[in-house]
């Protein structure tokens, strides 16, 4: 099992959040699908606003939160992360980021672990290749803040390699 998914599953268990048994791969209910899609779209919007503002830490926070939301959807289903290559290269234009984020989020309307995995993989890839940050460390910080129920998003500036 993917280490980040394992951490999300442990967080869900600690708060008694509903999730299928690992490996069950149950289909999301329509309402679960709508709820997860709303979260993904909200996080996608936050990333685009951060890109517009040029705030690297906020972009990283958005990418990590979006990746977390994708992992949470996979955990709810009892699925596993499916590794797939990310087909994005920095072309100097942020519009390419907007397009690929929007496309990957939209594909999650299928409710498939494969599509949620693609969003998670894209977030990790963009964090490393576009932001030049430590996605693993940033996600760990986000999960720890959720575990302690911090309301304010943690500062991820230490996760940037600059």
Predicted feature locations:
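Flexible "arm" and connector segments at domain edges
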Residues: 1-162
């Amino acid at each position: 099992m993917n280490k980040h998914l394992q951490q999300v599953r442990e967080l869900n268990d600690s708060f008694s959040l509903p999730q299928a048994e690992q490996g069950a791969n149950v289909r999301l209910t329509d309402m679960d699908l709508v709820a997860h899609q709303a979260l993904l779209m909200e996080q996608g919007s936050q990333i685009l606003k951060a890109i517009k503002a040029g705030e690297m830490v906020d972009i990283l926070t958005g990418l990590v939160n979006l990746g977390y939301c994708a992992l949470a959807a996979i955990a709810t289903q009892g699925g596993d992360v499916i590794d797939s290559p990310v087909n994005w290269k920095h072309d100097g234009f942020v519009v390419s980021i907007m397009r690929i984020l929007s496309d990957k989020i939209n594909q999650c309307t299928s409710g498939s672990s494969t599509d949620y995995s693609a969003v998670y993989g894209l977030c990790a890839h963009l964090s490393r290749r576009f932001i030049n940050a430590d996605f693993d460390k940033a996600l760990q910080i986000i999960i720890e803040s959720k575990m302690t129920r911090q309301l304010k998003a943690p500062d991820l500036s230490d996760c940037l390699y600059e």
